Amino acid sequence: MSGRPRTTSFAESCKPVQQPSAFGSMKVSRDKDGSKVTTVVATPGQGPDRPQEVSYTDTKVIGNGSFGVVYQAKLCDSGELVAIKKVLQDKRFKNRELQIMRKLDHCNIVRLRYFFYSSGEKKDEVYLNLVLDYVPETVYRVARHYSRAKQTLPVIYVKLYMYQLFRSLAYIHSFGICHRDIKPQNLLLDPDTAVLKLCDFGSAKQLVRGEPNVSYICSRYYRAPELIFGATDYTSSIDVWSAGCVLAELLLGQPIFPGDSGVDQLVEIIKVLGTPTREQIREMNPNYTEFKFPQIKAHPWTKVFRPRTPPEAIALCSRLLEYTPTARLTPLEACAHSFFDELRDPNVKLPNGRDTPALFNFTTQELSSNPPLATILIPPHARIQAAASPPANATAASDTNAGDRGQTNNAASASASNST
């Protein structure tokens, strides 16, 4: 979690809203096996507001925190597992997480299937329940497994996980949405298919230039230096810094900047990047330009990592963990980095022999920040496949574990027509 209590009341430009209109009763019954079945009136996550009855069973708690509780459940109609995130709804405000999740539709972002409201134990207490894709693992748990075994995560997995993370960031940033809590715990994984899905949009916000934002955001080890400096006019490049911290952690087997406080965090960053120049400090937060820092030289990146770390991985890390926010790569530029060239090889497979997940089904929306990058991001074999088959919706749920055959979308088709 980001270290601050989270309800659905926000100080950052949230507008009052009336009582939820889709508030419905929760009915409990038993199926033929005697299992408890809960039926609610829920609204689909995407599309028009058409509430419908949804029944689920086999409910159990799988997570909790300051945000609320997460349950696992099984949908009765399909037998699919889902995660239900239950958060306290402040009736004075719209729930920003819900508003954002209803906009998103991408193969590397956890999907909002339904949402519904339920009453709490106290009078007038209302909870918002988000019914999400259930994904069994996290990057955090997988990385911890390797670390405890005194092993490093195989580089092919580092490439797959980071590439998909950057795709998800390119997508949300194209809408002006900043996640603000990128960390290994919020990166869900299917261990069989290697599909990664970004989750937990409880801290996410659509950033508007000129509007202030809270600086106490993001979990400590992954906080960009401008946040530590108290900046309130930051950009979505704080997500890129966090992603750089995740990449470094996967390569090292431990967090790269493990500070116990904000000041300690800054010390850890300075140990690696050296003391920021006055100009770099001005770029992060102009109010700090007169602050005196001890003069420390940057540590060579090659000495930060193990000797066998791929040079391309180190080069990518150095382009993400930059003091100056505008000097950091964009997520789309990161996807095009040479570190990920192996993923663009038509013969690449997962270590278990399976095809890689969908990697090249870019939408025009995803490519909007830099359309010319499509020539790098969509390799020739994917362009040929796109030209030979009708384009499909890049964000269809079935894309997530079916490879890229026949699934590259209009952006790929356009690229194919221009370059084949």
Curated annotation (Swiss-Prot):
Changing K85R: Inhibits interaction with AXIN1 and ZBED3. It catalyses: L-seryl-[tau protein] + ATP = O-phospho-L-seryl-[tau protein] + ADP + H(+); L-threonyl-[tau protein] + ATP = O-phospho-L-threonyl-[tau protein] + ADP + H(+); L-seryl-[protein] + ATP = O-phospho-L-seryl-[protein] + ADP + H(+); L-threonyl-[protein] + ATP = O-phospho-L-threonyl-[protein] + ADP + H(+). PROSITE patterns: PROTEIN_KINASE_ATP (PS00107), PROTEIN_KINASE_DOM (PS50011), PROTEIN_KINASE_ST (PS00108). GO terms for cellular component: beta-catenin destruction complex; cytoplasm; cytosol; dendritic shaft; glutamatergic synapse; growth cone; meiotic spindle; membrane. Phosphorylated by AKT1 and ILK1. Upon insulin-mediated signaling, the activated PKB/AKT1 protein kinase phosphorylates and deactivates GSK3B, resulting in the dephosphorylation and activation of GYS1. Activated by phosphorylation at Tyr-216. Phosphorylation of Ser-9 in the hippocampus peaks at CT0, whereas in the liver it peaks at CT12. Inactivated by phosphorylation at Ser-9. Phosphorylated in a circadian manner in the hippocampus. The active site is at D181 (proton acceptor). The keyword Magnesium does not apply. The modification Phosphoserine is found at S9, S389. Coiled coil: none annotated. GO terms for biological process: animal organ morphogenesis; autosome genomic imprinting; axon extension; axonogenesis; canonical Wnt signaling pathway; cell migration; cellular response to glucocorticoid stimulus; cellular response to hepatocyte growth factor stimulus. The modification Phosphotyrosine is found at Y216. Disruption phenotype: Embryonic lethality at 16 dpc due to hepatocyte apoptosis. It is found in: Cytoplasm; Nucleus; Cell membrane. ATP binds at I62, G63, N64, G65, S66, F67, G68, V69, V70, K85. Changing S9A: Loss of phosphorylation; No inhibition of activity and constitutively active. Activated by phosphorylation at Tyr-216. In response to insulin, inhibited by phosphorylation at Ser-9 by PKB/AKT1 and RPS6KA3; phosphorylation at this site causes a conformational change, preventing access of substrates to the active site. Inhibited by IL22 treatment which also triggers phosphorylation at Ser-9, promoting inactivation. Inhibited by lithium. It holds the Pfam family Pkinase. Residues 386-401, 409-420 have a biased composition (Low complexity). Monomer. Interacts with DAB2IP (via C2 domain); the interaction stimulates GSK3B kinase activation. Interacts (via C2 domain) with PPP2CA. Interacts with CABYR, MMP2, MUC1, NIN and PRUNE1. Interacts with AXIN1; the interaction mediates hyperphosphorylation of CTNNB1 leading to its ubiquitination and destruction. Interacts with and phosphorylates SNAI1. Interacts with DNM1L (via a C-terminal domain). Interacts with ARRB2. Interacts with DISC1. Found in a complex composed of MACF1, APC, AXIN1, CTNNB1 and GSK3B. Interacts with SGK3. Interacts with the CLOCK-BMAL1 heterodimer. Belongs to the protein kinase superfamily. CMGC Ser/Thr protein kinase family. GSK-3 subfamily. This is Glycogen synthase kinase-3 beta.
